[in-house]
Structure formats: C-alpha cells, structure tokens
C-alpha cells in the first residue's frame, strides 16, 4: 500500500481501454494516403472472399463469413448473421462491431438489409436485426 507522499510524487496510472473493433477507429486521408483516427459506428467495404468456417471446441456448425476490404483499406473478417445470404465476391457490404465468441478472429458483423446485403427471408421475430420488412397481411 503506497503512502500519500508516494502517490503525490507518482500518481496511479489509469487503465488504457483497448478497442474491441479497431478497424472502425481508423479513417483514410486520401490526399496523404494515410490512416487517421476517426471513430465510426459502421464502415462500408467490398467482399474479397465469402466462405464457411467451423467454430471452436464445444460447438459444431458451418458459420458463414466474409473477408471484407474496408473503405479505409483495412481487411477484416466479418460474420454473416441469419439463415441464407446473397453475398459473393465484390458485393458491397456495411459492417458493424461485435465479435462472434466461437469464431477466432471474427470481430465484426455484416449489417443485413444494407447496401448489397439482402434481409433474411420469411423472418417473423427480431426483424430489425436481420433487415426484414414487415410482412403483408
């Protein structure tokens, strides 16, 4: 336990909070061709690869993912939520933060119903999260 005098001389250091989605915290200065610190809630990107991967140990499935080159030049792996999708190479997508716990290295989600990504078909509940329009009566 430090004394008051020790704390006056050298105060406690505050913890540095590390971002869970670092690619959303960078913007591209196209004049200087360098990354700048600009926080954004979502970013646009182009799919460079679409595929499936298997989750970590206790779980078993084929999870859909896309490798996305963002508008700031960073390439990330993003999860495609919902049942079925229409994404392929060169599709323009919107990504948001949010990791997938059982897929290592996947720190982003693709926003369904935005840009080239279609919403989930015949979805009744939680429609806003999957970009599905309200069904006609």
From Swiss-Prot:
Residues 9-18 have a biased composition (Basic residues). Belongs to the universal ribosomal protein uS12 family. CDD domains: Ribosomal_S12 (cd03368). This is Small ribosomal subunit protein uS12. Residues 1-26 are annotated as: Disordered. Part of the 30S ribosomal subunit. Contacts proteins S8 and S17. May interact with IF1 in the 30S initiation complex. GO terms for cellular component: ribosome; small ribosomal subunit. One of its GO terms (biological process) is translation. Keywords: Ribonucleoprotein, Ribosomal protein, RNA-binding, rRNA-binding, tRNA-binding. It comes from Listeria monocytogenes serovar 1/2a (strain ATCC BAA-679 / EGD-e). The keyword rRNA-binding applies. Transmembrane segments: none annotated. Gene3D superfamilies: Nucleic acid-binding proteins (2.40.50.140). Pfam families: Ribosom_S12_S23 (PF00164). InterPro entries: NA-bd_OB-fold, Ribosomal_uS12, Ribosomal_uS12_bac. HAMAP family: Ribosomal_uS12_B. The keyword Iron-sulfur does not apply. One of its GO terms (molecular function) is tRNA binding.
């Amino acid at each position: 336990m430090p004394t008051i005098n020790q704390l006056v001389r050298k105060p406690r250091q505050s913890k540095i909070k590390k971002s869970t989605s670092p690619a959303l915290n960078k913007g591209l200065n196209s004049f200087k061709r360098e990354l700048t610190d600009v926080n954004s809630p979502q970013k646009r990107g182009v799919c460079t690869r679409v595929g499936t991967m298997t989750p970590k140990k206790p779980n078993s499935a084929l999870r859909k993912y896309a490798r996305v080159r963002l508008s700031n030049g960073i390439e990330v792996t993003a999860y495609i939520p919902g049942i079925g999708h229409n994404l392929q190479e060169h599709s323009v997508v919107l990504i948001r933060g949010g990791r997938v716990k059982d897929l290592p290295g996947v720190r982003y989600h693709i926003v369904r119903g935005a840009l080239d990504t279609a919403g989930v078909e015949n979805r009744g509940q939680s429609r806003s999260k999957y970009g599905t329009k309200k069904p006609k009566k």
